[in-house]
Regions:
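Charge-rich, low-complexity N-terminal segments
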Residues: 1-73
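Residue-level signal for functionally critical sites in structured catalytic/ligand-binding pockets
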Residues: 11, 19, 32-33, 92-95, ...
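Functionally constrained cores in energy, signaling, and assembly domains
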Residues: 15-18, 29, 100-109, 117, ...
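Generic detector of leucine side chains in alpha-helical contexts
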Residues: 16-19, 24-25, 51, 66, ...
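Short, solvent-exposed recognition patches
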Residues: 43-139
């Protein structure tokens, strides 16, 4: 009979209660420490840009000295596979101050996928002057603005869901990559 009293439901609850409290405290502490409100993870595109600049047969230009709030989140190039004289394409993606996307592409291959994916089927809407350069303004099939221009056989493209003013800020910041 004494054994039956020791195994009552009340005794079981009293035994488990400290475990439940400790578990809830541990879960709450972990959740609190991981509660980063900004999911954007900026990257440093320098190595990708330098690789493209070293392998390209043209003077690579990229957005530089962008104002606060423009954070690079992706960078890729096909320069790692390029042989002498082969075309080189460089792409850099940014999150803008309005938390929208702005993408930059430069390539000496007019048929490069990152260019054709945006420009094929885009409706040209005229030109716009940005930092003394004339850019063709288009609307893509997804309804996004695309600013493009060609310079010495190299296409420069700025596009994305960001407002036009932010895309123009990216375009205005484009400058040649400094040789290292």
């Amino acid at each position: 009979m004494e054994r039956a009293n020791r195994m009552s439901a009340a005794n079981m609850i009293r035994s488990l209660l400290p475990l439940v409290v400790v578990s809830l405290l541990a879960v709450g502490w972990i959740a609190f420490r991981q509660g980063d409100p900004d999911p954007v993870r900026p990257i440093d595109p320098t190595s990708t840009v330098q690789l493209a600049a070293a392998r390209a047969g043209y003077a690579v230009q990229v957005p530089s000295e962008l104002p606060d709030g423009y954070r690079p989140t992706s960078a890729r190039t096909d320069a790692g596979d390029a042989v002498d004289g082969a075309p080189v394409t460089l792409q850099i993606g940014y999150v803008t101050p309005s938390t929208e996307y702005a993408g930059y592409v430069t390539s000496d291959d007019p048929g490069a996928d990152p260019l054709t994916d945006v420009l094929d089927g885009a409706e040209q809407e005229g030109t716009v002057q940005v930092a003394g350069e004339e850019w063709t303004r288009s609307t893509t099939g997804r309804g996004e603005t695309a600013l493009s221009r060609e310079e010495d056989g190299v296409t420069l493209l700025v596009t994305g869901s960001a407002p036009d003013a932010e895309l123009e800020t990216v375009a205005a910041a484009i400058a040649p990559v400094a040789a290292r």
